[in-house]
Amino acid sequence: QAETATEEHRAELEERIRRGEVGSVLMSVGATAGNTPQGEIGVDYYNHLQRIAVEESPQGIPLLFGRDVIHGHRTVYPIPLAMAAAFDPAAVRDCYREIAGEAANDSVHWSFAPMLDLSRDPRWGRIIEGGGEDPYVGAQMARAVVEGFRGDGTDRAGSVLACAKHFVGYGAAEGGRDYTHAEISDYALYNFYFPAFRAAIRAGAKTVMSAFNDINGEPVSASETCLTGHLRGHLGFDGMVVSDYGAVHQLIRNGVAEDDRAAAALALNAGIDMDMVDFCYLDEGEAAVREGRISMETVDRAVRRVLRVKAAKGLFAHPYCERRPVDYAAHRMSARRMAEKSAVLLKNSGRLLPLRKDAKILLIGRGAEARAELHGSWALDGDASATPDFCLAMQEKLSGGGFLRYDRDCESTLTGADAVVFALCEDPYSTGENACISDITISDYERSILRRAKALGKPLVGVFFYGRPIAMQGIAEWFDAILYAWHGGCEVAHAAADILFGDVNPSGRTPVTFPRLATHLPLY
């Protein structure tokens, strides 16, 4: 699999495709695409690449285009962890069906989702991409996402191939640090880590991504035990396995391969059928076959698996993207409903909520004017400028003499306010891949605002636009009411305002444990 080329390397990519050296294109640049700016998807460009593959390459085999469509495409829905808080698999499935339609309309055949890593450590940045700490809930989310992506059929227009990732144990990395070692017993593998993958496979997932990490000292991407014994033998998977970004080359750093040729042999023999981006298979595979490190039977097996996936997607019959009308307005309403279902009312002392619409509200905190922060990580194609902020959403709710004053840093002495609403937000770049943190609480800046707000002596409501659960000791007791709205997507501001003023009943429940202190971790 090749990466989408930057402008100066486009001719090189096209020539590789023309020579038949590329079977798939990653529609982004860099391993941490969720936290780095990405170029606009161009249907004409990807149809151009497809035309080269189909009409000019020796084999005439169509390309498979893959992109990280994690929790939305043009329309950004709540992060997967927030969707899990809704405990409504049918609603999740419906959202992903809409997501698939938008992505397919932009040439995407294959999404690198769902992430099925069981995670019990909120310091890990990628906790936001999964279904939480419970294997049963994770399995329900897995099935819902795969079924949503598939729609009426994998080969139908508007569908996207799902990729269950990361097999296996990536979320168990020590200390919540990305890419690090994991110690997992067979008991834990079978009872905690396999159920979500089993559910995804039974729901029809045709691709699986291997994990970066090692388990008990063995890198997963070189593990025949994991990728053939567990995945294909125990779980019955018969589709295609793709490596994570650069994971084959990384086997050198893992200390099990001396060079790319050895890494290619280890990975292909273990069961990885497609090498993502690092070209170890392309550059060294032929030599490894000549040297007897890889058999032609193994090569043919991997090729058949890749071709079966392309055939299942219908690429041989319909290789080009034909754009269709998409009801983006309806999708935004779906995103709003999911954000409403996902929000969790953690506290409501004295039945402070709902607020009156004729109330005098002092709104504080930078979360009130945030836009991109509401999307969270892995929102590659959402337009944050079109996302309403929380200040606007709150203002729209007031009537009958009610008014809202926004003072970001709480420097006001508005003693006539009926309530103070503090909007807190987490930087999305502190979540996602390679974005782990040790301090899972609010910042010193936010604590200073909290002290000023409390000094006003008014009822205090906290609205948290966060990705991960945070340590609540020294925070929760300062608030009279707390609404955890998560990184809830492009309509979460309206959803949170709906809940605060009683137009929507808060129904979300926590899919992960909120620790009092980070020292309690892991806690589940």
Regions found by a protein language model. Name each.
Residues 1-524:
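Glycoside hydrolase catalytic-domain context in secreted enzymes
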